[in-house]
C-alpha cells in the first residue's frame, strides 16, 4: 500500500480559515449595521459589501441578533438596529440610574407623610365644626371687628357683581392723609354702610352713593294745628225732594277713629235748608264742623233719568214724601243751606276750590293728599288688564303723550 505524500499548499489568493469564520463575519455585519442611516440596513446591500457568496450565513446572523432583541425586521430584506450604541453601558449611567431610583423612593415617602398630615387636619376641622360648644360661636360680631381696628372709621360697602374699585394714592395735607375710594358699577346701586362701634347707639343707615339731594337738606319743621272748637249740633229740617228722580249717595260720616283724632269725640254733620231752595245746588254742604274742607257732594245722575224730566213726577214725589214722612232706609241727599247760616270759608280753602283758578300749586296739592280728609283714595276705574299697556313710545315721547295728559305749569 502506498503512502500518501505531503499535502500541497493552497493556491495564492485563497482566504484563510479565520477569514471564513462566522464570528468575523458577524463583527463586520454589526459594524455595517451601526453605520447605516437610522439603523436600517438592506440585506442584499450588506451581502454585496461583505462579499458573502452564501446569503445563508447572513440569515443565520440576523436570526441570532433578532432572537436576543438587538434588531427587528422592517420588511423581507430590511432590518433595523435596536440595541444601544457604543459607550452606553458605562459606569456613570449606572450610578445615575441608582441615584434616580433613590430619589423616587424619597419622594414617595414624603408624599405618604403629606397624605397623613392632610388626614389629621381634616379630622381636626371636623372635630371643631361638629362640637356643640363651638357651633354657637361660629360668627363674628361688629364689636370684634371694631376692636381690631380701634380708632379707625369702618365702612361696609355692598356692591353688585362687576363693580370696579380704585384707590388713588393718598394726599398729605398738614400731616394728615386724605384717603379716597372710587367705586363704579354699571349693573346696580352701591350701598355704603357705617359700622356702629357702640351697641347702644342707633342702628346704621345705608346711604346710596352719591347721596340724594333730600338728605343734604335739613327737613322742614312740622307745625301742629291748634285744637278746633267743639261743633254745635243743628236740627235737620224737612226738605223738598228734587224736581227729577236722581241716584243719590249717602252723606259721608266720619268714623270714630278720625273724629277722635280731630276733636276727641264723635259728632255728626248737620244739614239745614229751606223748602224754597233750588235743586241746582242741592249737593252742597251747609256747614262744615271739625274744620273740614267744603267738598262737592253732588249726587250721581244717570243720563236716562236726566232726559225724562216731568213736572208731574216732581209733584207726586213731593206729596208722597210729605205724607209718609222720613224713611230711615232712604238715603237723603244734602241740599243748599240758608245763605244766612253758611259759615264763611277761610281764604285758603276758598282759593283751593275757586273754579276760575287754573291749577293748584304742587306743595298745596301734596299737603291736601297727605291729610286724613282725602285719604284713603278710592280707585274708580277698573284694574288694568293685559291689553292696557301694549303700546310703545319713542325716545322723545313720555307718559303724557301716551295718555293725552296736558303738561301743567306748576
Curated annotation (Swiss-Prot):
Pfam families named in the record: E2F_CC-MB, E2F_TDP
Residue numbers spanned by region Disordered: 1-20, 203-258, 303-341
DNA-binding region: 16-85
Post-translational modification: Differentially phosphorylated in vivo.
Modification N-acetylalanine, positions: 2
Region (Interaction with RBL1 and RBL2): 387-404
Knockout mutant characteristics: Postnatal lethality, probably due to the absence of ciliated cells from the entire airway epithelium and the epithelium of the submucosal glands in the paranasal sinuses. In the nasal epithelium, ciliated cells are replaced by columnar secretory cells that produce mucin-like substances. In the proximal lung, reduction in club cells is also observed. The combination of no ciliated cells and excess mucous cells leads for the chronic rhinitis and increased susceptibility to opportunistic infections that cause lethality.
Record bears the keyword Ribosomal protein: no
Cellular component GO terms, alphabetical: chromatin; cytoplasm; nucleoplasm; nucleus; transcription regulator complex
Protein name per its UniProtKB record: Transcription factor E2F4
This protein's encoding gene: E2f4
Modification Phosphoserine occurs at: 381
Renumbered ranges of motif HCFC1-binding-motif (HBM): 386-389
Biological classification of the source: Eukaryota, Metazoa, Chordata, Craniata, Vertebrata
Compartments where located: Nucleus
Superkingdom of origin: Eukaryota
Region (Dimerization): 86-181
Quaternary assembly: Component of the DRTF1/E2F transcription factor complex. Binds cooperatively with TFDP1/Dp-1 to E2F sites. The E2F4/TFDP1 dimer interacts preferentially with pocket protein RBL1, which inhibits the E2F transactivation domain. Lower affinity interaction has been found with retinoblastoma protein RB1. Interacts with TRRAP, which probably mediates its interaction with histone acetyltransferase complexes, leading to transcription activation. Interacts with HCFC1.
Keyword Transcription regulation: yes
Region span, Leucine-zipper: 43-65
Subcellular location, principal: nucleus
GO molecular function, one term: protein domain specific binding
Organism of this sequence: Mus musculus
Family: Belongs to the E2F/DP family.
Transmembrane segments: none
